[in-house]
């Protein structure tokens, strides 16, 4: 699967998505992420255009704070298109509000924002309770282990910049193999060791 950003220029977005579809072919899932850039009616129109190009995932079509707007998109988006949000959730209460509002087809959570492994697993427990899939946002080395403990985890985001940083700063960062990350259960913690010399290169003394 491939995810691309949309929302900066709504008039150009359908043609950009079409170009991406032509580049990756019909056999690869295509996701789009608007980061809340669209208004409600604009997002609905874009959902129709994107669905015609085989887009299966529409992330933050409107602001993640607009739960009514997200519910509107979830109810009216074309069949087969998931509405996803949650990467800016910081507390279990935020995730619960989204789920109670019926605002998402897939809840996103990011352990670097929502209270670490414990916060992520609380979001996972809420997904269990509401029977909603969970997607991990970025930081694949961290989330690979957590997703193994989350029964409703659908996938995690393999974001190039995060992967590059993880490989630069840690020994033992997991390689992707045929779209999969396989944590080694014999290793403690997250299975990595810091490269302290690399950390020191970016140290700022105050």
Regions found by a protein language model. Give the residues of each.
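Gly-rich Lys/Arg/Thr-decorated short loops/hinges at beta-loop-alpha junctions or inter-strand turns
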Residues: 1
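Catalytic core of soluble alpha/beta enzymes
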Residues: 4-137
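Flexible C-terminal active-site loop/helix
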Residues: 135-206
């Amino acid at each position: 699967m491939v995810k691309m950003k949309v929302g900066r220029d709504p008039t150009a977005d359908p043609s950009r998505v079409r170009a991406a579809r032509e580049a990756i072919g019909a056999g690869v899932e295509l996701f789009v992420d608007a980061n809340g850039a669209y208004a409600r009616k604009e997002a609905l129109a874009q959902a129709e255009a994107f669905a015609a190009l085989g887009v299966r995932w529409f992330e933050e079509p409107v602001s993640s704070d607009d739960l009514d707007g997200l519910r509107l998109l979830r109810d009216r988006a074309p069949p087969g298109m998931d509405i996803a949000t949650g990467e800016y959730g910081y507390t279990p209460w935020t995730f619960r509000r989204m789920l109670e509002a019926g605002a998402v087809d897939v809840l996103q959570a990011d352990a670097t924002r929502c209270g670490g492994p414990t916060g992520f697993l609380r979001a996972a427990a809420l997904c269990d309770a509401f029977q909603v899939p969970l997607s991990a946002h970025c930081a694949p080395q961290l989330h690979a282990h957590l997703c193994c403990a989350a029964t409703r985890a659908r996938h995690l985001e393999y974001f190039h910049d995060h992967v590059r940083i993880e490989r630069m700063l840690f020994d033992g960062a997991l390689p992707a193999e045929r779209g999969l990350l396989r944590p080694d259960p014999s290793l403690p913690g997250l299975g990595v060791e810091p490269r302290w010399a690399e950390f020191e290169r970016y140290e700022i003394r105050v």
